[in-house]
Each structure stands twice: as structure tokens, then as C-alpha cells.
Amino acid sequence: MWLLLAFLSAALLGFYDVFKKKSLRDNAVLPVLFLNTLFSSLIFLPFILVSAFAPSVLGGTMFDVPVVGWEVHKFIVVKSFIVLSSWIFGYFGMKHLPLTIVGPINATRPVMVLVGAMLVFGERLNLYQWIGVMLAIVSFFMLSRSGKKEGIDFKHNKWILFIVLAAVAGAVSGLYDKYLMKQLNPMLVQSWYNVYQVFIMCPIILLLWYPKRKESTPFRWDWTIICISIFLCAAD
């Protein structure tokens, strides 16, 4: 069952990338990202409110969001910054690169998590995992070769660097999740980190995008922006 859910999550993330690419086409990046965080937080907000004011409704279910203090929330805020950093790099990179390049680079993220788990948590990889790591390295090399045929130089293209940084930050988030999940409720983390991202994005929008909005790519509404949030939350 868990393996089936993992495959379903991967499929949903595939649609998430497609909707994200369509939303970013000829569009302003930061407003799209802000709306994604806003809609994602609105999806989880009812669970937070019901758990706080009518705890008996969701109590004992997987949708229950425990009420905790700042001593716990501060760890979730850190996760919000890590994830948002990954998204900012990833959104800018995806806007300027084809999905055929972005997808395979993002696919190396689980390998980074494996290596990080080995270095940080002292875990040991089995033979099949080592084979997977080596295949990922070879695939990345072959991808850089094929990218040159499309006019994309991996060494001198800043958008490639952005996607790589997004993957690294995503791997760091995955490792941090492993640390958090040992002591915190998954729904607690999932719900509140989306909410905190909205508050983090507000000054970014007001200070970095809004004053210069007329000098850059204009923002246009696209219904696929809502689909980004829906498919991401479902995958998570």
C-alpha cells in the first residue's frame, strides 16, 4: 500500500511540474509563487482551525493538527525558509529551461538525500542504493552532454545553477524532515510550514517585485496556478 502511495505521489508531482511550467510561461515568477503558497495554506487552514477550536472532530485521525507552542513552531519556521529557498530557485530556473532538462535534474534529489543521510545520520547504503547513486551521476553527465545539443551549457547557464541549488535545498529539506518527523506530527509540520511561507513571501513581494513590477514580466492570472497548490498538497 505504501509503495502504491509513493508512486501516486510521484505521479501527482509530475502533474505539479507541468502546471508550474504552464503557469510560469510569460509570467512573473514571484506572484505565481506567492499565490501557490497562499492557496496551499488555505487548503490546510481548515484543519488547523478545526483542530484548535473543535478538537473532537479530527482527534485521532491523520488530519488532526496538534496545538503546540513556539518551542515547536520555530523548527517549522526553519523548514519554511528552506523549502521557500528551494522553490524560489526552482521557479526561476523552470521558467527559463525546458522540462526535459529540469525534470531529470530534480530526479537527482533523492540521491542527494541518500548521500546526506549517510553523512549526517550515519546511515549505510546497500548495494542497490550505491548503484542508484552511480546511475544518477552518470545520468547527470549524459544530461549535460545532451543539453549542449539544445544550446544549454551546464557550466555557464545560471538557470541550470538555480535548478541545482533548488535540488540541493530540496534535499536539505528532506533531511530536515527526517529530523522533524522523529518528534513532530506530520500534519502539524505540513500545515504550518505552508502558513509561514505566506508570511515570508509577503515582504518579498512588497519589497522585491511590487516596486519594479512595471519594469519586468507582467503578472497574468492563470487557473493552473491553483492546480499547482492542489497537486502539490495532494502529493505531500
Question: For each of these PLM feature ranges, what is it?
Answer:
Residues 1-20, 25-30, 35-81, 87-97, ...:
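Membrane-interface interhelical linkers
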Residues 158, 170, 174, 186-189, ...:
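Alpha-helix initiation and capping sites
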Residues 14-19, 84-89, 115, 168-179, ...:
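Short helix-kink/termination motifs in transmembrane helices of multi-pass secondary transporters
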